[in-house]
Structure formats: structure tokens, C-alpha cells
């Protein structure tokens, strides 16, 4: 494929290899970085009994048939150097014996059935027509897919013109049930409440640029980072629903506007100065009715609405450390959306609210087109080291870490079980056995990082400085930390991925002097910011940290690339 100039970096690192420098927990004098960071190691004995229990749970896991999207193969043909790359989707329902035949303008291209999900057609012409046919036991089944080769290696289209708007987020889902993804965009204008003349919107488009609908969020959200939405086929009808927080003044894709639901005569709560709060140059609305709404994916029409839980009121519940309205409103406004199979079969919407102090959560599934509440969780005991109070990130992951067939909700240093109960808050221990709960952080990864272990592991960073481990590697089922680094400063980023084939399993790294390591905690370099990278356009970055914002599988092998 022709190389684009997108910043995707081949991530096999060149560095001087070191023997393990891990030790028993050391204080901050273990390492002094030239940039002023001090670094110590935290190491705990791996609980082999719990590790064995995880393997037993994995072997005995139920084989649930989960309700998934009904997608097609996603057949595409993209021009590259000296030919066309044709690729398609492998589905979770596919049999191990399924193979394929590929045709171009009626001519079969493969000598024997294709066992992979791509084929490079040398010398193909632009706009050639390709047909993919499924093969079982050497015979074509009659199921086939057709596509026309693109004239360039991307597709683009014009969006609806909106003066002063930025596109700053997006998602994909099959909104109309044709088996192909459509595109959803979040677009925001100026969010200054004193000067704005328009409001944030969510738009849906087909990949040919056809505009499907627009939802106008209205005047009662003025902080774009708190505008989240989820798009997925929640009820199994073949079409994705769109689920998001809504307000009085929100207008759906059919032009229906939510009115004065509480009868107080107000639908724009941003007009009152006393109802506005500012914290670190961001504006927040202190009090407004909040809802959770379902929108038809094909039309954008609201089909159900319920009161949003957990409520952000009273504000005093969201911190015992602060009493100023700005901080309290910021904490109450922070929320995360996710999708989890809490019963092991059907998807539920999960909301987690709060991060730095109080953490609350709720979940719903969709039944007969209506919200059905699964549970609501309130974190009560702020003084309990085992409580998830103060232990939540800006992101969440849903995954079945205990292999009971049902998803858990993980957010950095905490986990909530499928039934809404707290599983654990991650802790570390000093040499006297005293526990320290690890706090809120900005990034984490959950994956099967060790090829010799079937359990999930978490690599996470934490904001608070001078923790015994403010970047660490822990068991995602039990929360037990195996090793980590202590810092004298906030560790704001971390990343875990398999980027180097010379080490078993994943590699881990992070910001603020986090030296890259293997999954055993052995340093694999003598620096954290002296690397050279070849970007996809062939240029080289020198004296750089390993990028840690996003990872992708880009070039067809089993190593990760880094998108930055």
C-alpha cells in the first residue's frame, strides 16, 4: 500500500539492552533523571495461587453466545504501489473452515481458496470491480460481496457547513441495518456562554457523504469534554441505537425539542450567572435537569428518555476535600460511557461518574425499546482503603476479567463487578505491610499481555506524585500490583503494547522518566527519551520518547504500531 504521511510509527525500539534493575521497594533515590525526575522501583511477590485460580476460571469459562452487531464483510479495495489491496472483515461467528475466492471483473484471482482476509492484486486498474465469495469444504456457498476499487487510499466527503464549528470526535456504527458502518461526528462551536450563538451537535453521515440527521444538544452543556455518546445495536434489531446525555432544549433528528420537563419555567440554564461555575478556564453549568436518551440510529428521533443516574446533585457529595462550586461542579460533571455485557448475553449501557473523589455508577439495558435499570452504585466510605473512592480514570474498559461470562467495568485503579458491586481498589504496600490506595490517573491498558498466562493484566499511570507506585502493572482480576515505578511527579501517560519481538509478551512505558520495560519489570533500555523512530513517511525522529497516545495494527503483522 502506498505510504501515507499520517504519523504512524514503526515501534521496534533501538536501545541498549540492560539486565533487570528491579528490586525490592526502593525509595526515590533509586534513579535520578537529568530532567529532574527521581525514580524508584516497587516490586511485590507474584501470588502464584491466584494466578493458578485465574487459569482454572479461564478453562471453566462459560461459552456464552453474545448479541453482536450484524455486520457484512466490509469489503474494500484500496490502491497501492503496483496494485490494489483487497481486504475484508473476519466475523466472530465464522467457522474455522471458512475460506474465500476473489474475483476481479469476473476473473478468479486465486489458485486455491484464500485463508486470510486480504489479497494484493498486482497490476489492478483503478475502479476495478471485485467480488468476494465464501467457500466451505471447497465449494462456494452462494454468499458473496462486491465492491469497486477506490481511486485513492482514503474516502472523504464534505460535511454540512456550520460556521465556527470544529469536528473534534467521532464514532462508527451500522445505523440503518445495511451491514455497513455509518459515521457519527461531534461538532462544537465556541463554547463561551457569553458569546455563543449555536450549540454542540451530533451528526450522522453515510460514507458517501449523505447526511442522515443532526441532534442539537442545546444550551445546557457548555463543556465539550463532557459530551459523550455511544452507538451500538442494543436491542438486536440489526440497527444501532445512539445513546447520550440530553437536556431540556435538546432537539432530536426529527426536530423534536425537549421542553420544560420540571415546570420551573426555564429551559436554558446557562442564562443565569449564579448557575455558572468556572474551574481552570472551563465553564460548567451547576444545576440543570439531565436525562439519558435513546435515539433511532437511522432517523435520529428520540425513542425513550429516563432521568440520568447517578445525579450530580447535591454537589457536596462529590468531594470532602473541597467546598468551592467550581471544583465540585467539575467533579460532578465528569462522566464516562461504556458498553458491557453484564448478563453475559445482551449489551448494557454503563455510566461512571466522578474520578478524583466520589465515584458512582449506573447501568441500563434496553427492553422493548425502553431503558431498564440494571443497578446504581454509590461509593460511600471515603476513608476505607478498599473503597473505590478517588480511584477512577478519565476512561473505562469493559471486559470479563474473572471469566464468569459477564463483563466487569475497569477504570485505572478500580474495578466494578457485573452486578454493580465493588471488586477492588488497587493498593500497594510498604515493607511493614501498610496499604496505600492508588489514585486517579489519565491512562491505562488492559490486555492479555503474557503469552504464558490467560488472565488479563493492567498497566496504569496515576496523577498523584510520590505514590509507592504511580505507574504500575497489576492483575486485572484481583487488583494485585506485581511491580511498578515510584516518582516524584505526576505520571500523566502510559502505554502497553507488543512493539518488540525480542521480548516475550507486551512492552510497557510511560511519561516522566518511565524507562521501557518488559512484562516482568526488567528495563529494556537505559533511557526513557533517547529513542529513534522511523515514521511511515520514512523520516526519523531522534531523542524522542516512545509515543503513548494510541496504538494501531497497521502493517499486517502482529506487532502494534503507534498513532500519535
Regions found by a protein language model. Name each.
Residues 20-38:
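Sec-dependent signal peptide cleavage junction
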Residues 4-25:
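Sec-dependent N-terminal signal peptides of Gram-positive bacterial secreted proteins and lipoproteins
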Amino acid at each position: 500500500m502506498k505510504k501515507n504521511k499520517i504519523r504512524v510509527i514503526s515501534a521496534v525500539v533501538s536501545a541498549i539492552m540492560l539486565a533487570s534493575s528491579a528490586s525490592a521497594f526502593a525509595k526515590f533515590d533509586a534513579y535520578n533523571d537529568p530532567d529532574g525526575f527521581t525514580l524508584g522501583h516497587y516490586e511485590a511477590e507474584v501470588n502464584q495461587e491466584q494466578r493458578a485460580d485465574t487459569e482454572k476460571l479461564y478453562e471453566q469459562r462459560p461459552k456464552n453466545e453474545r448479541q453482536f452487531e450484524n455486520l457484512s464483510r466490509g469489503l474494500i479495495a484500496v490502491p497501492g504501489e503496483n496494485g490494489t489491496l483487497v481486504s475484508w472483515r473476519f466475523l466472530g461467528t465464522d467457522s474455522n473452515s471458512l475460506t474465500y475466492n476473489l474475483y476481479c471483473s469476473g476473473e478468479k484471482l486465486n489458485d486455491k481458496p484464500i485463508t486470510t482476509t486480504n489479497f494484493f492484486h498486482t497490476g489492478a486498474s483503478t475502479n476495478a470491480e471485485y467480488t468476494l465469495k465464501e467457500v466451505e469444504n471447497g465449494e462456494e456457498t452462494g454468499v458473496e460481496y462486491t465492491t469497486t476499487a477506490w481511486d485513492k487510499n482514503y474516502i472523504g466527503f464534505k460535511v454540512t457547513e456550520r460556521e465556527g464549528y470544529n469536528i473534534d470526535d467521532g464514532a462508527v456504527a451500522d445505523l440503518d441495518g445495511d451491514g455497513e458502518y455509518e459515521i457519527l461526528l461531534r461538532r462544537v462551536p465556541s463554547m463561551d456562554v457569553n458569546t455563543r450563538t449555536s450549540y454542540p451537535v451530533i451528526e450522522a453521515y453515510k460514507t458517501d457523504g449523505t447526511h442522515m440527521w443532526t441532534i442539537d444538544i442545546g444550551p445546557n452543556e457548555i463543556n465539550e469534554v463532557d459530551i459523550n455518546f455511544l452507538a451500538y445495536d442494543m436491542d438486536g434489531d440489526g440497527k444501532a441505537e445512539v445513546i447520550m446525555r440530553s437536556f431540556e432544549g435538546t432537539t432530536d433528528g426529527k426536530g423534536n425539542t425537549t421542553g420544560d420537563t420540571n415546570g420551573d419555567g426555564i429551559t436554558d440554564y446557562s442564562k443565569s450567572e449564579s448557575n455558572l461555575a468556572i474551574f481552570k478556564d472551563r465553564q460548567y453549568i451547576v444545576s440543570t435537569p439531565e436525562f439519558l436518551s435513546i435515539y433511532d440510529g437511522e432517523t435520529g428521533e428520540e425513542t425513550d428518555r429516563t432521568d440520568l443516574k447517578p445525579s450530580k446533585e447535591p454537589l457536596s457529595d462529590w468531594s470532602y476535600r473541597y467546598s468551592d462550586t467550581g471544583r465540585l461542579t467539575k467533579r460532578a460533571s465528569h462522566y464516562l460511557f461504556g458498553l458491557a455485557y453484564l448478563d453475559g448475553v445482551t449489551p448494557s449501557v454503563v455510566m461512571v461518574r466522578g474520578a478524583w473523589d466520589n465515584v458512582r455508577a449506573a447501568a441500563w439495558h434496553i427492553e422493548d425499546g425502553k431503558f431498564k435499570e440494571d443497578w446504581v452504585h454509590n461509593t460511600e466510605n471515603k476513608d476505607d482503603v478498599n473503597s473505590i473512592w478517588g480511584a477512577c480514570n478519565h476512561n473505562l474498559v469493559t471486559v470479563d476479567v474473572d471469566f464468569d461470562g459477564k463483563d466487569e467495568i475497569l477504570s485505572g485503579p478500580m474495578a466494578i463487578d457485573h452486578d454493580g458491586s465493588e471488586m477492588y481498589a488497587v493498593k500497594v504496600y510498604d515493607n511493614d505491610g501498610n496499604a496505600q490506595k492508588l489514585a486517579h490517573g489519565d491512562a491505562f491498558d488492559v490486555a492479555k499481555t503474557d503469552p504464558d498466562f490467560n488472565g488479563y493484566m493492567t498497566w496504569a499511570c496515576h496523577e498523584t506524585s510520590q505514590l509507592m507506585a504511580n505507574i504500575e502493572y497489576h492483575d486485572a482480576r484481583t487488583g494485585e500490583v506485581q511491580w511498578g515505578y515510584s516518582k516524584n511527579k505526576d505520571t500523566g501517560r502510559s502505554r502497553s503494547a507488543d512493539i518488540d519481538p525480542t521480548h516475550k509478551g507486551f512492552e510497557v512505558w510511560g511519561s516522566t522518566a518511565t524507562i521501557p520495560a518488559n512484562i516482568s519489570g526488567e528495563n529494556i533500555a537505559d533511557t526513557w527519551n533517547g529513542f529513534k523512530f522511523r515514521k511511515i513517511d520514512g523520516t526519523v525522529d531522534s531523542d524522542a520518547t516512545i509515543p503513548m497516545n494510541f496504538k494501531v495494527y497497521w502493517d499486517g503483522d502482529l506487532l502494534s504500531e503507534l498513532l500519535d
